[in-house]
A protein has these predicted regions:
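Conserved beta-strand/loop subsegment of P-loop NTPase cores
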Residues: 135-142, 165-175, 197-202
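Canonical P-loop GTPase G-domain recognition
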Residues: 177-230
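C-terminal effector/interaction modules appended to NTPase cores
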Residues: 38-162
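Helix-rich effector regions associated with P-loop NTPase G domains
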Residues: 47, 58, 84-101, 112-131, ...
Length: 365
């Protein structure tokens, strides 16, 4: 039997495990509801339920309700059990672990996810990699320059979050390095995405102080993502109050960042209550650090559905003449007309077309 984590308070008396689940619904500064799950586990025999907080190759670091962690592995037949991804187990997954007599730990079951977010596998465009599961919020770190984050990358990230039901926000970093023209570009981008109800923040991670951004990470599991070199590691260190992640330089030749994070890991935020809650199984505040990302994509999505994951395009699509309109110049296309009249940003429409091209070529199928 699987553990239900999304209904009203419920208790299970199971053998060999006993679970008690308490669900509390909260709101946050973004206006997004989320569930803060507290699970109490009674250890029995050599089975235990845990939370995956680290992933290195085929090895997973699992955090248990009693505050201990262990290195765990996945059995081969588990990896191909209907999971279309290079990694069937991801950061943020709740798993069941069995310890053998020789002391090795094996993940034997993956509990249902409330959501997850994927990226494209480099040089293997038809495959996906799950960045994290059970995420309360995904934050994309964006830079106007040093290096430049493209609007296509931003829109692919947001569309992916929409498709997999992950609330998202944008954090514009390195604003202290911007000139007047770049500051105007920053203001325009913030206005664009805030008009679509995506929260945006403008910061300098090197000068990060107590602010609404700090509160953004409280009482939730947050995924930090972005291109290499956008200052993700610097921001992570500032939030955690210590040097956890290595920071890197920008390539002078290509103006791109060099990878400093090589694997995904989840960190507790000190002072958020997570330390006190660990013993009782509370979720507290966590940040998931991921390696620099080069591309996002949609998996198992029909081309007619892509517009559903662009809030502006979806809004105007209701007025299209044909229900299966792809918004590429069909007669009576309200989206195409909205782009021509400036009601949909051209950059957003071009991002939509790029994903549509990928889907038609079955790159993510």
């Amino acid at each position: 039997m699987r553990l239900c984590r999304y209904s009203t308070p419920i208790a299970y008396n199971l053998s060999p495990l006993t679970y008690q689940v308490t669900i509390s619904h909260n709101s946050n500064s973004m206006g997004i509801g989320y569930s803060n799950v507290q699970c109490y586990l009674t250890r029995h025999s050599n089975y235990m339920k845990g939370l995956v907080i680290k992933s290195i190759g085929t090895s997973y670091g699992v955090y248990f309700e009693d505050g201990t962690t262990a290195d765990c592995h996945v059995k081969g037949n588990f990896r191909i059990r209907g999971i279309r991804s290079t990694n069937p187990v991801a950061i943020g997954d709740y798993v069941e672990v069995i310890t053998n007599e020789d002391g090795t730990n094996w993940i034997t079951e993956l509990y249902d996810r409330k959501n997850y977010i994927i990226r494209r596998v480099t040089n293997l465009s038809y495959a996906s990699h799950i960045l994290a599961a059970n995420v309360d919020m995904a934050a994309l770190i964006v830079t106007i320059n040093h290096p430049k984050t493209s609007t296509t990358f931003i829109d692919r990230f947001l569309a992916t979050c929409e498709a997999y039901r992950v609330p998202a926000c944008l954090i514009f970093n390195k604003i202290d390095l911007l000139n007047e023209e770049e500051l105007q570009e920053l203001a325009s981008l913030r206005q664009l995405y805030e008009s679509l109800d995506y929260p945006t923040y403008a910061i300098s991670a090197l000068r990060l102080q107590e602010s609404e951004l700090t509160k953004l990470f409280q009482n939730r599991i947050t995924l930090l993502s972005g291109n290499s070199g956008v200052g993700k590691s610097t921001l992570l260190n500032a939030i955690l109050g210590k040097d956890i992640a290595r920071t890197g330089a920008i390539s002078s030749a290509h103006h791109k960042g060099m990878h400093t994070t090589t694997f995904s890991e989840m960190y507790p935020i000190e002072g958020s209550g997570v330390q006190e809650e660990r013993g009782s199984g509370g979720s507290g505040s966590w940040i998931i650090d991921t390696p620099g990302i080069k591309g996002f994509g949609l998996l198992d999505v029909e081309k007619e559905e892509i517009g559903h994951y662009f809030r502006d395009i979806f809004h105007f699509s209701h007025d299209c003449r044909y229900s299966n309109c792809l918004h590429t110049g069909e007669p009576g296309c309200a989206v195409y007309q909205a782009v021509a009249e400036g009601e949909i940003a051209l950059s957003r429409y071009e991002s939509y077309l790029s994903i549509l091209d990928d889907t038609q070529e079955r790159k993510y199928r």
